[in-house]
């Protein structure tokens, strides 16, 4: 039996941004990313490729003021599209984790497609609060991005930076680790025929 690909879409238009996202959880890593923020585009591309998600993100925001609105609003819409794509959660693995290195940095991500949104981040070095990549991406936004993603997709997400020095490496490892963990958690489990919960609902 052929199963239809799980595709989710979402849009958001405010006075600060106009964002459209489409994600195919059963894709092959094809990406179409344009946010007007080159480093953020790079991170979302890595997210799609390493999650094996077909991912389209088109965003127009007030980047002449700051990247913050565009990054955080993109996380809202991406989370909503993920929730749409995941659907009723029947047959998914639900839990997954990934430890991912990038040179000197090591990041771990743990995901539960729980229906109970929760987010924890720990271990980032203090200079992540003040670092700026490419002149436009303040790494303090990492926490906001992943928290907003977790809340809007209604997942439990833990991100742990075990160690690292370069803000670029830490940030990229975080995006890739979250993508890999999500890929594992939304994967269909041939031994799971129903909702993966003793309660019968997620």
From Swiss-Prot:
<dbReference type="Pfam" id="PF00475">
    <property type="entry name" value="IGPD"/>
</dbReference>
<dbReference type="GO" id="GO:0004424">
    <property type="term" value="F:imidazoleglycerol-phosphate dehydratase activity"/>
</dbReference>
<comment type="similarity">
    <text>Belongs to the imidazoleglycerol-phosphate dehydratase family.</text>
</comment>
<keyword id="KW-0963">Cytoplasm</keyword>
<dbReference type="InterPro" id="IPR020565">
    <property type="entry name" value="ImidazoleglycerP_deHydtase_CS"/>
</dbReference>
<keyword id="KW-0028">Amino-acid biosynthesis</keyword>
<protein>
    <recommendedName>
        <fullName>Imidazoleglycerol-phosphate dehydratase</fullName>
        <ecNumber>4.2.1.19</ecNumber>
    </recommendedName>
</protein>
<keyword id="KW-0368">Histidine biosynthesis</keyword>
<dbReference type="InterPro" id="IPR038494">
    <property type="entry name" value="IGPD_sf"/>
</dbReference>
<comment type="pathway">
    <text>Amino-acid biosynthesis; L-histidine biosynthesis; L-histidine from 5-phospho-alpha-D-ribose 1-diphosphate: step 6/9.</text>
</comment>
<dbReference type="GO" id="GO:0000105">
    <property type="term" value="P:L-histidine biosynthetic process"/>
</dbReference>
<keyword id="KW-0456">Lyase</keyword>
<dbReference type="InterPro" id="IPR000807">
    <property type="entry name" value="ImidazoleglycerolP_deHydtase"/>
</dbReference>
<dbReference type="GO" id="GO:0005737">
    <property type="term" value="C:cytoplasm"/>
</dbReference>
<dbReference type="InterPro" id="IPR020568">
    <property type="entry name" value="Ribosomal_Su5_D2-typ_SF"/>
</dbReference>
């Amino acid at each position: 039996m052929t199963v239809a690909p799980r595709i989710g879409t979402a849009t958001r238009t405010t006075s600060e941004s106009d964002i459209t996202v489409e994600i195919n959880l059963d894709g092959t890593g094809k990406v179409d990313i344009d946010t007007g923020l080159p480093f953020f585009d790079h991170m979302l591309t890595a997210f799609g490729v390493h999650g094996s998600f077909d991912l389209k993100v088109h965003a127009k925001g007030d980047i002449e003021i700051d990247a913050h609105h565009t990054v955080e609003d993109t996380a809202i819409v991406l989370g909503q599209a993920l929730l749409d794509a995941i659907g009723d959660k029947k047959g998914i693995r639900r839990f997954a984790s990934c430890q991912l290195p990038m040179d000197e940095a090591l990041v771990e991500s743990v995901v539960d497609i729980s229906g109970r949104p929760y987010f924890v981040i720990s271990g980032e070095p203090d200079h992540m609060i003040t670092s700026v990549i490419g002149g436009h991406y303040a790494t303090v936004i990492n926490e906001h991005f992943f928290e907003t993603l977790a809340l809007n997709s209604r997942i439990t997400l833990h991100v742990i930076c075990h160690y690292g020095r370069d803000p670029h490496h830490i940030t990229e490892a975080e995006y890739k680790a979250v993508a890999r963990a999500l890929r594992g958690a939304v994967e269909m489990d041939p031994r799971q025929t129903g909702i993966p919960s003793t309660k019968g609902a997620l």
